[in-house]
C-alpha cells in the first residue's frame, strides 16, 4: 500500500543522503573537469562536466520528493582531494560503483518496503545511470593506462 507522507521514514533520510551525495558529486566532477582541462584532457573535461550536469538532475529529482523541515542524518562522504586526472577518474569510478551496487539498490528496496513505489523506481533508475557513469569512467581509465586515449 502506497504511503502519502515521507515524514519520519527511512526513505526520507535516504533521499536526503542521496541528494547530498549527488550534490557533492556534481561539485567534485566540476573540479575534476578543470584539472583534466589543465592537464590537456579536453574530452575528459567535457565528460566530467556532462556527468556533473547529470548528477545535478539526479539531485533535483531526489529533492522534489522531500517535504521540507529539518532532518538529521548520519552519512559518510568522500573527503577526497583533487588529484591527477587518472586519480580523479579512479575516485569517480569508485564512488559510482558504490552508488550503483550498494546505495541505490538498498534505498530503492527500502522505499518499496515502506510503500513508496514511485520513489523506489526513481532510485532504481538513478542507480542504472550511475552504472553507466562508472563504465564510462573505467573505459577512460583503461584508455589512459593503455596509452590509447588519443588513438
Label each PLM-derived region with a short phrase.
Residues 1-151:
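Non-heme di-metal
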